[in-house]
Amino acid sequence: MNKAYYIGLMSGTSMDGVDAVLVDFAGEQPQLIATHTEAIPSHLLKGLQRLCLPGNDEINRLGRLDRSVGKLFALAVNNLLAKAQIAKEDIIAIGSHGQTVRHMPNLEVGFTLQIGDPNTIATETGIDVIADFRRKDIALGGQGAPLVPAFHQQTFAQVGKKRVILNIGGIANITYLTGNREEVLGFDTGPGNTLIDAWIQQVKNEPYDKDGAWAASGNTDQQLLAQLLSHPYFSLAYPKSTGRELFNQAWLEQQLSEFNQLDEEDIQSTLLDLTCHSIARDILKLAPAGELFVCGGGAFNTELMQRLAALLPDYHLDTTSALGVDPKWAEGIAFAWLAMRHNLGLPANLPAVTGASREAVLGGRFSAK
């Protein structure tokens, strides 16, 4: 059988590394051939975190980081190919998400901005790059996010089965597959790992709360949880999307200003409950029972999964592994899929999810030649 090799590149709002996946789309289901994670060097990570907040000299910093992130993404590709022992000539295209530094679709003239220069990636890998997937959807009046529901629909939908696919990265998003293959809903529920990561990084200088152990050692403060859940985003109707612009360290510090007496682990437990409660509320609005499959980094947080299961007793909870897709690499596979859709001239957004006026072919092509 002929191969249809594409590479997907993803770095999410967690900024915990560049995930690179090699996927074969020749069969009915995507086949994951090889994976690689390229760590983000600390100086680059600090620069990206600064760029995500308003500041001075932003254009110079943006230009430099755009190229630097492009070089890092190219390094991820070259290391992936070396690991897989596959030649660049065998790859049809790379689908690069880039690194989001602003996502503000609800302004009068909404926009989203991802960096990681695709020209640099194409030049340094010798492979054509499909990138800038979100802005076409925004140009059509959409949110530009989430984009993974179209991939979830094609890969996970089954006639007669009500399924929720929950992707927990920095931000959490859900795809509701109604059991009718044509009908799908999806949106960002709010914070996924972004606040629990930020708090443990600030207090303990650890990158993330492994297995949710620190959160499990604390007790949730119901007053703080109620205050956090009163954020207007949680009561917005979908289509909706969000990011670090709303849920960031500055917002968290503002929320904690009246709760100085709380133990640090109690704050961590409360932040984990914010993630779980906001997700569960939105899922229950869609359907009282069904199947729930989790992917993204949150799928590996034992405490998170247990709390979610307790809030959704009538859902069968599992990871996307049960459906044949490794939860760690699901989003990278989705961007390889988006590159394939572009290459075939096929639409990849879902207007019911993003609010765009129509379906569209997403992304632009950046030639290696």
From Swiss-Prot:
Molecular function as annotated in GO: ATP binding; kinase activity; phosphotransferase activity, alcohol group as acceptor
- What is the superkingdom listed in this entry's lineage? Bacteria
What pathway, per the record? Answer: Amino-sugar metabolism; 1,6-anhydro-N-acetylmuramate degradation; Cell wall biogenesis; peptidoglycan recycling
Q: Which UniProt keywords apply?
A: ATP-binding, Carbohydrate metabolism, Kinase, Nucleotide-binding, Transferase
Q: What is this protein called?
A: Anhydro-N-acetylmuramic acid kinase
This enzyme's EC code(s)? 2.7.1.170
Q: Which Gene3D superfamilies match?
A: 3.30.420.40
Q: Reaction catalysed by this chain? A: 1,6-anhydro-N-acetyl-beta-muramate + ATP + H2O = N-acetyl-D-muramate 6-phosphate + ADP + H(+)
> Entry's SUPFAM superfamilies?
Actin-like ATPase domain
Q: In the UniProt record, does the keyword ATP-binding occur?
A: yes
